[in-house]
């Protein structure tokens, strides 16, 4: 026999009970008229009786509402709570809900009150009523598309860069991500393509370097990337994987100056530089599309890179790029576990 799910008395039913009680209708008769069990009405009259033993529909409904509120647990991320203050701090630092959740779990493994799932963080943000605070919180989140579009859907640019070396002859150890010093590169452009920032991402640690450039020409890319790569210790200068953007036309000069071998992806194949593509998505939190990138100094770009490199990454088992890179450079045979 299927058990019928119990339903609470509705306000209109309480109004009828008040009227019938005033008319001295028996409890069983009231239950029959409402299609309810007599025990339901007995419990209702006992719980919500007035001080003089009477019954009022409005006061009964108010008592019911008050009991319901009292039975609800306090929200874990209450706006005035300590945990929300911690979460808000990390959101302001552009951390994602997953990064925040994993960090709290690692920092406070035995304190469930200081742990929160990333779903709860998302729910807390979107539960805010419409207004400036809600917009600020949502702006802290990484903007993700349901479908990634190719970086370029223009004409095939093969043949425009002399002496390209294909990604298909790149050393296999680059794919393994077991050794540092193998980079992926890209150029993100600002408003009207009038400004640019060079991006370098180390494949093993996901560490990012940003380079201020006056424009997207090959001369600017050569000067910017050469200067940044020369600032690294020799073991971190091994290979660079790039798309067939014309800004890399002077790759031979880059290799001669830095010792970094440059390999080129197939046309329209952003997945062959997946680490850099993912990093570009993170960077858009700091450098939104349509921004005039020329207003950022190199010091400001370095601060953005430091912020990204200090964030825990799921793919690094919730270590940060800085932690992974520091560990490997200090003890090449003792690496932090990564996925």
Curated annotation (Swiss-Prot):
Asked if Nuclease is a keyword of the record, the answer is no
Record keywords, A-Z: DNA recombination, DNA-binding, Plasmid, Transposable element, Transposition
A cellular component term, taken from the record's GO annotations: cytosol
**What PROSITE patterns does the entry give?**
INTEGRASE (PS50994), TRANSPOSASE_IS30 (PS01043)
This entry's Gene Ontology molecular function terms read: DNA binding; transposase activity
Q: Which family does it belong to?
A: Belongs to the transposase IS30 family.
Q: What is this protein called?
A: Transposase for insertion sequence element IS1086
From what organism does this protein derive?
Answer: Cupriavidus metallidurans (strain ATCC 43123 / DSM 2839 / NBRC 102507 / CH34) (Ralstonia metallidurans)
Q: What's the name of its gene?
A: IS1086
């Amino acid at each position: 026999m299927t058990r019928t799910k119990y339903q609470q008395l509705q306000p209109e039913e309480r109004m009828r009970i008040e009227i019938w009680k005033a008319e001295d209708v028996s409890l069983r008769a009231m239950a029959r008229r409402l299609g309810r069990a007599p025990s339901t009405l007995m419990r209702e009259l006992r719980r919500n009786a007035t001080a003089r033993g009477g019954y009022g529909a409005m006061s009964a409904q108010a008592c019911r509402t008050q009991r319901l509120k009292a039975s609800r647990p306090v929200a874990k991320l209450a706006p005035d709570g300590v945990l929300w203050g911690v979460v808000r701090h990390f959101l302001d630092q552009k951390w994602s809900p997953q990064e925040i959740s994993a960090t709290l779990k690692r920092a406070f493994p035995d304190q469930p009150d200081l742990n929160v799932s990333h779903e709860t963080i998302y729910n807390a943000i979107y539960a805010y009523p419409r207004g400036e605070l809600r917009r600020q919180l949502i702006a802290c989140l990484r903007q993700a598309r349901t479908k990634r579009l190719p970086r370029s859907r223009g004409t095939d640019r093969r043949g425009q860069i002399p002496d390209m070396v294909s990604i298909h002859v790149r050393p296999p150890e680059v794919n393994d991500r077991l050794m540092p010093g193998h980079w992926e590169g890209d150029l993100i452009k600002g408003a009207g393509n009038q400004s640019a920032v060079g991006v370098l991402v180390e494949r093993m640690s996901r560490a990012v370097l940003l380079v201020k450039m006056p424009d997207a020409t090959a001369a600017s890319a050569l000067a910017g990337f050469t200067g940044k790569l020369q600032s690294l210790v020799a073991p971190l200068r091994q290979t660079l994987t790039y798309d067939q953007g014309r800004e890399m036309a002077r790759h031979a000069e880059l290799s001669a100056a830095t010792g970094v071998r440059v390999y080129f992806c197939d046309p329209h194949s952003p997945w062959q530089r997946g680490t850099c593509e993912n990093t570009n998505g993170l960077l858009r939190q700091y450098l939104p599309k349509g921004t005039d990138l020329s207003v950022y100094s190199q010091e400001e770009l370095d601060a953005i890179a430091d912020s990204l490199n200090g964030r825990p990454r799921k793919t690094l088992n919730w270590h940060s790029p800085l932690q992974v890179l520091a560990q490997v450079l200090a003890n090449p045979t003792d690496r932090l576990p990564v996925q």
